[in-house]
Amino acid sequence: MSRAVFLDRDGVINRAVVREGKPYPPATLAEFEILPGVLDALRELDEAGFLLIVATNQPDVARGLQSRETVEAMHRRLRNELPLDDIKVCYEVESPTSLCYKPKPGMLLEAAQERNIDLSRSYMVGDRWRDIGCGRAAGCFTIFIDRGYAEELMDVPDVTCADLVQASAHILHHASLEPAKRSV
């Protein structure tokens, strides 16, 4: 089975727009800025054999605040510039019937089924409590990127890091401590 690093998008891979202490996705492709160090961090994880999968809530599309075309253009840029294996997107708003909207683990469970991923040997990296809740619900090791937002963490992450560069180093170290698993 494969190991994966699941990554939130806004605030982890690209710069989030922060207003009054709360993060928002960039509204336009011109505002979409990949954070420093992200490319190198992802290359190291890719070279170590991890699948790299973005799992992102984009409810502004359902709310009519952003077009799906703009989100897809941002994702084309990510695919062109970063060594990503997949991008899972939940375009829904939070509701009891949504299976994909984080903190529900639907996007991670779907990726695990499609790509034969061992979630217990995988990681979820995010900058909001929803990401940590999602990773925990899926059975992943969770890493919180602390951006200092004015919101409370609902779930305790396994580790807190300053950015994806630090998170990547932690993942590579943590994974090196894991006993080798033989395929049968």
Residue ranges of each PLM-predicted region?
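Active-site flanking residues adjacent to catalytic metal/cofactor-binding acidic residues
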Residues: 7-9, 56, 126-127
